[in-house]
Amino acid sequence: MLMKRLFSSSHVFSSSSASSNLLKIGSVLKQARTFADDDVLGYSKLTHDANPLHFDAECAKNAGFTDCLVPGMLVASLFPRIIAAHFPGAIYVSQTLHFKLPVYIGDEIIAEVQAVSIRQIKNKYIAKLSTKCIKRDGPLVIDGEATAMLPSLVMEPPNLEITSS
């Protein structure tokens, strides 16, 4: 089996104390990530998103941006990543997104997922989560709300590796 790092330049951390590893209202999970050219290229190949705003600096400048953009959905993919890292087997039910500002190659983004409400249905939990991404220097770039079905409220240490054969 081959072990691969999903994102070599990402860091997952939690604001929960070591004594309490149960998700509760107000719990915050975060991941820092810096996107590189290779990330945008890989995303484009996978999704067939060939928008020139992501690859052609002149096109991006003509559209009013300072450089090529990181696709918004690539940035937003940090949210399910955080949830899956802490709750293996979680099912992402829904997500709303509001794209506020552009993200450029090399920007360090901090994604945050905060539990807003939690309800138990049989042996599963439905968690409503506030989601946001900010640039390291402060501006909000994406916000929204997610709903996930969790198999447990126990927050596992983040699993950042995948196995492929």
Swiss-Prot record:
UniProt-listed InterPro entries: HotDog_dom_sf (IPR029069), MaoC-like_dom (IPR002539), UPF0336/Enoyl-CoA_hydratase (IPR050965)
The keyword Transcription regulation is assigned to this record: no
**Residue range covered by the transit peptide:** 1-35
| Record's subcellular location | Mitochondrion
Per the UniProt entry, the Enzyme Commission number(s) are 4.2.1.59
Task: Report the main location listed first in the record.
Answer: mitochondrion
Q: How does it assemble?
A: Homodimer.
Protein name as catalogued:
3-hydroxyacyl-[acyl-carrier-protein] dehydratase FERN, mitochondrial
Organism listed in the record: Solanum lycopersicum (Tomato)
The gene behind this protein is FERN
